[in-house]
Amino acid sequence: MDDLLRGLRAAAEPTRLRILALCARAELTVSDLTQILGQSQPRVSRHLKNLVDAGLLERFREGQWAFYRLAETGPTGPLARQVVDLIPVDEATVQQDATRLDAVKQARAEAAE
């Protein structure tokens, strides 16, 4: 029950909900998230630490980059997906985040060419 409560507390904040929704759609870096959310790197990093510590996000390295994605395993992995499924996709902020995410993914693809 402690894991569930920790996960619910971590998710109960608007920016962290936005991060969960974004990481459910793509594997993202802190830099990606600061660009999409329009928030400072320290603030985004603090939110990411809370979400990783609660088991809602996973952090993994690829070369020099650290990426974040929605957790699929562990005691709170299923909770992460359930929380994301409850976020209304027609919410204006969620739609703005999705548009910005598409732009970040496009820029990443162009840089890789």
Q: PLM features: residue spans?
A:
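N-terminal helix-turn-helix DNA-binding core of bacterial DNA-binding proteins
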Residues: D2-P42, W65-P75
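Alpha-helical residues within the helix-turn-helix
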Residues: Q35, V52-D53
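Residues within the DNA-recognition helix of helix-turn-helix
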Residues: H47
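Amphipathic alpha-helical dimerization/coiled-coil segments
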Residues: D2-D3, G74-E113
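Beta-hairpin "wing" of winged helix-turn-helix
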Residues: D53-E62, R69-A71
